[in-house]
Every structure is written in C-alpha cells, then in structure tokens.
C-alpha cells in the first residue's frame, strides 16, 4: 500500500477548550500549502505504525496517490480521481447513537451503537481493521466518530468503491434508516460518507489539542489495530452499477420527501464538460 501523508505549516487538528464552563471549538486550520511524505506499507501492522508516526507530527493522510512530490505548495491537480487504491476508508461521522436489535423472542431493544455492532451490520465482523478515533470523539457525546481502514485484496478504482459505499447505504438497514434529506430537500445526507473514497480526500488523523478538558480516550490508544479472521477484504458479491444506485437514490429521496410532506421530484441529467449534472434543480437558499 502506497500511503501519502501531508504536512502543513501548523498541526492539522482541532482544538477544544473549556472556559467558564463553555466548550470552545477551533476547527481544522485552513491551509493551502503542503509538503508530501510518501510511505510504503505491506500490511495493516506497518500501516498502524505509519499512522501513529504521522499523527504525532500533526500530519493528515491523503486517500489517493500524488502524481508528484509536494514541497510547500498547493495540492491542486496533484491527484487523479480515477486512480485505483488497495485500501478502504470508512468515515463514520453520521451514524446514530443507538440502534434497535431483536431478541430471540422477537422483542425490540434499543442498544448503544458500538463499532463492533456497526461492522457486524456491514458484514465486516471477521475482517481485520485499524480504527482511528476522530478528534471530536467523546467531546460532546458518545456517538461513533472514527475512521476505519481496511486492506483490500487488490486495487479497485475509486469510482467503483464509491458505488460500493452508496450500495451499502441502501442495503444496510441501519444506514438506510438513518438517511436524511439535505437542507435543499433534493439530495441525501449519507450516514456512511460516500466521499471517503475520493482520491483528493484529506483524512485527519492527528489527536486533538485539549485545554482544560479530560481526554475522553483515557489510556485507550486513539489509533489501534483490531485483528480479525481475515486480513484483507474482497469487494465481491456484485457491486451495483452507477445507474442502479442512481435509481435507488432517487427512490429514497422521493420517499423522504413524501414523509416530509414535499412533492415528488423528477430527476433529469445532462453531461457538461464530461460531468453529469442535474438539470432544473429546485430553488434553494445558500
């Protein structure tokens, strides 16, 4: 696995502070110039060491491959959206705090959603993974906020992985039931981030700066390897086509619009400059 870490002129992390009982949050710094660091990882164990190394330095991880080394410069145009990758990132930031489970007698129970329960719902309970708990995890609530890294059996094109993520959002009841409309009412807020596969995606791995706040992780490592029965994941079993996922998404949007008392929408697209765009979108407020 080729891994690319990016360094900026300041640590790429969030800051949380308590002042007079009020929680003050400082977002990730806005920065445009980066220096890249290329690393080679043969398995998740070596990837774990590299993640810990660069997290301690305040670097972030780039999902894709950089075409050329960066030295204190913009990363614009440095990645190819169609490049293949042999590792998967699950960005968990939109999951519910609880889930419903059934007892053998058929009774419905409300259970706190743990990472193990989520991976079981995804069918990934037997696969080894690295979990990196996000800077915001445990600050305001116990909701899962993490990145999960899984080694793949071979390189897959990033657009194909995106279709796999979209399909999972539709097929896994936990994710499907968590879907919401965006403010415009014309698209979906995905429970499992479908952009985490994009080759230009920055994955923030550095621990937060905490001032007058106890670290919610305690002595638990923020980045850890969890061994499973299988060390790699094959994305087999059939991945939906783009058209199939588009139909599922349109149906789900209209179902949610109906629940919200909105009229159904008809979706039409055209290709502009090689990019498919929605024609005649509804009016929205920005």
Regions found by a protein language model. Name each.
Residues 3-8, 25, 30-56, 72, ...:
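Catalytic "initiation/cleavage/transfer" segments centered on a nucleophilic residue
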């Amino acid at each position: 696995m080729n891994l690319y870490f990016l360094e900026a002129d300041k640590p790429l992390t969030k800051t949380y502070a308590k002042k007079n009982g009020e929680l003050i949050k400082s977002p990730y710094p806005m920065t445009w110039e980066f220096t890249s660091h290329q690393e080679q990882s043969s398995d998740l164990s070596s990837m774990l060491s590299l993640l810990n190394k660069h997290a301690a330095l305040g670097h972030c991880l780039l999902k894709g491959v950089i075409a050329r080394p960066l030295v204190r410069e913009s990363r614009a145009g440095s990645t190819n959206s169609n490049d293949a990758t042999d590792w998967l990132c699950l960005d968990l930031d939109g999951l519910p705090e609880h889930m419903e489970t059934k007892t053998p007698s058929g009774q419905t129970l409300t259970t706190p959603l743990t990472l193990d329960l989520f991976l079981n719902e995804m069918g990934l309970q037997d696969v080894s993974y690295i979990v990196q708990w996000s800077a915001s995890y445990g600050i305001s609530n116990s909701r899962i906020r993490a990145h999960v890294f899984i080694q793949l059996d071979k390189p897959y094109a990033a657009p194909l992985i995106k279709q796999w993520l979209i399909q999972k959002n539709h097929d896994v009841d936990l994710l499907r039931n968590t879907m919401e409309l965006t403010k415009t009412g014309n698209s979906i807020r995905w429970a499992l981030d479908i952009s985490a596969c994009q080759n230009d995606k920055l994955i923030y791995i550095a621990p937060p700066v905490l001032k007058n706040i106890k670290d919610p992780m305690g002595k638990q490592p923020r980045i850890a390897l969890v061994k499973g029965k299988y060390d790699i994941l094959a994305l087999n079993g059939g991945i939906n086509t783009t058209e199939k996922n588009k139909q599922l998404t349109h149906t789900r949007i209209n179902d949610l619009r109906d629940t919200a008392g909105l009229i159904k929408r008809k979706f039409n697209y055209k290709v502009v400059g090689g990019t498919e765009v929605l024609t005649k979108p509804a009016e929205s407020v920005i």
